Amino acid sequence: MQIVGILLLYDANFFLLYPRGIIVNGLLAVGIGGFIGAILRYGISEWMNTDTFPYGTLAINIFGSIMMGLLMMLLSREYISHEVGLLFCTGMIGSFTTMSAFSFETMNMWNQSQLQGILYAMVNMIICPIGAFLGWKIGTFMM
């Protein structure tokens, strides 16, 4: 394969070389998916979050975990292409769900009520991995 491009990441001492086309397809897939996921996240958060509880973020994290499990199962069995995986998993689900929002909201809830902060964190850390597992099982059942 002919190496046609160099991507500079982080600093001048770190270079990654990519074969022709891989970086363009991957970047476009992640970018388009990221745009869609970010828009969905914003809309759902605005619609569902309240002043007392971030219902939107919780719903996003649970649904995103289920979808990630389903999509990763499909990707692992090659029912979807690598580029489709980048579009949906890395791009859309990656920007749709976010650890930073979860962390910030947990901290805010902890400051209001330690019990509520602990419960919110525990629900996310227990339900979301279960959601990923369920998504995987749903995908297995569908195939």
Model regions and ranges:
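Membrane-interface helix-loop junctions in multi-pass transporters/channels
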Residues: 2-143
